[in-house]
Amino acid sequence: MPIDNLPPLREVIDIYGLQAHKSLGQNFLFDLNLTSKIAHQAGNIEGKPVIEVGPGPGGLTRALLAKGALVIAIERDERCIPALLAIEKHYPKKLKLICNDALKQNFSKLFETYPEKPRIIANLPYNIGTQLLLNWLLVEPWPPFYESMTLMFQREVAKRITAKPQSAYYGRLSVLTGWRTTAKIAFDVPPQAFIPAPKITSSVVHIIPRIQPLTCSAQKLSFVTKTAFGQRRKMLRQNLKTLGGEMLLAKAGIDGTRRAETLSISEFVTLANLVI
């Protein structure tokens, strides 16, 4: 059943000549049943502000608007703007378009005058998805400018985001995500839901900020985790040599022969708090 009376997305892509560009990490999501499922995963968004990054031809945008959201869509690719303007005309005063690179967008400033925090709901471009997430995880002040994030990533990235200690996917991204938020994989999205179809499965991850994460400098924790996971197979006393090595680990009560993937988030926080 159609969510609106706008043309089907395949038709929109043809009308505006929107071939996905690999250089922009684009894979257009055209299955409107799935876009509605993503919008539903974010909870009740009627009358709520929503940030969407990389809307492309507007498949997810339409699902968000159909559920009553007030959408602020940030799109770098100017080719997509005419298709998005057609959606804006269909939903007057419900869609705001910003033509900008999301990596350069000051999100905190954009929403400082809004009466309530936005939710971030997006099928993120593959080539900038991880960096955008890191930017949003490390933003200051905390609690952040957003209420929650419902984001699509490559399945492997989603596993890294939600991984636990002692697992192959556990790494810097897992620690930084788990420190400040709770995250879960909501569902998978098959390749055939996209144009063009990628070679891998994607996953939607739902992320909610912790109001009071363990006290720690975001910059220090980011640096310590980057250093600790620099060479995964090496012992911590080797990887953390430049930060104090055995002495630092002894202060933290951590065995220097352990590897980074065995440490809990709280142990990483302890290390970061000891770094001068």
UniProtKB/Swiss-Prot annotation:
Its EC number is 2.1.1.182. It comes from the Bacteria. It catalyses: adenosine(1518)/adenosine(1519) in 16S rRNA + 4 S-adenosyl-L-methionine = N(6)-dimethyladenosine(1518)/N(6)-dimethyladenosine(1519) in 16S rRNA + 4 S-adenosyl-L-homocysteine + 4 H(+). The keyword Transferase applies. Specifically dimethylates two adjacent adenosines (A1518 and A1519) in the loop of a conserved hairpin near the 3'-end of 16S rRNA in the 30S particle. May play a critical role in biogenesis of 30S subunits. This is Ribosomal RNA small subunit methyltransferase A. GO terms for cellular component: cytosol.
